[in-house]
Amino acid sequence: MGGHFWALIATWTFLCSIRVVLADESFEQELGLSAFPDVTKVNVSQDEYTRMMRTYLHTLRESMDNHSVPELQTFDAETITWHPKKKYVTRLGFSGVSMSSEMEIEQADLRILVSSFVDAPSPTIKIYQILSARRRRLLDEKVVYLSSTASKWCEFDVTSGVDSWLKGNRNLGIELQCAQCNNSVLQPLQATLSILVYTTPKRVRRSSPYNYEEGGRTDCINGEKRQKCCRHTMKVTFKDLKVPQISSIIQPKSYEAGFCKGRCPYNYNHATNHSRIQSLVHKLDRKAVPRVCCAPSKLAPLDVLRVDPYDYTKLNVEKWDNMKVLECACS
């Protein structure tokens, strides 16, 4: 009985693993990608990050028809200190971070270079904003994948902390905590803040060359009870999709994808002549032919900065086709 039970468990585990692999492959295929990198092996240097982030931002400026695009600013830690009584606590000082109140933060990442680590290859590191001598605020927490033979770069989201400095809170630095780490891991060889910031008042912007906020041709009108086919807003945040490989996307963290929904009454906003004919035939015989449906009629690509799937130390700027809905029609 016991042997049969464990055999069933082993079989179920094997089938589940196959299902996960197939799901990942399907996700790659649906996006038209050849591969995703192994996130446990990603190790992008600060020089490579800075170079390719600026290339990505330049690409955005060209594709967005001069709509506001942030600038990249980097600040190295001036001080790295260790808590005298707690070996698993390290403090980073960034007193040189100077920004005016007119600036606006898009994204702020703390990137640290940590030494090789044998004891626990995947410890959990917590990042805190220091508010006072006794108060801390958690900014980010993640499992990092270290190497037993080489130093590795790790990245953390500290946007809310840097934004609070911009709004007048005292800049007392950032604290790293890792109960599973030893001193060598929490003594970063290098620590850098990489900040995407709007240095001038930003104009209307979205991640496309179209200015939706001023009203697209098929954008939905707020307050309409029974909306006809129109474009609704839909913000997609990549980390919320719960697909491990998608964490290799560096930028954008999120984007406005949009979707189509609404009624398609007779002779309303047809996408093609075929949809007009289908609408007429449906009116004659509703059982034989379905009503036309609200669907995207114009799509746009998305510029993406992500880890090279074949060289985990490099970044690529890519254009992913058909990622954003621009207009909707009955089809």
Task: List each language-model region with its residue ranges.
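Cysteine-clustered segments with highest specificity for TGF-beta superfamily mature ligands
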Residues: 110-112, 135-219, 278-317
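Intrinsically disordered regulatory linkers and targeting segments
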Residues: 14-61, 198-242, 252
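Folded, disulfide-stabilized extracellular/luminal domains of secretory-pathway proteins
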Residues: 206-331
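N-terminal leader/pro-regions and domain N-caps
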Residues: 2-107, 111-152, 184, 303-330
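Eukaryotic basic, amphipathic alpha-helical target segments in cytosolic regions
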Residues: 19, 64, 116-118, 135, ...
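Helix N-cap / beta->alpha transition motif
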Residues: 95, 157-163, 237-239
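Short, well-ordered loop/turn elements at secondary-structure boundaries
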Residues: 106, 168-169, 254
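Short coil/turn segments at secondary-structure boundaries
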Residues: 122-124, 186-189, 272-274
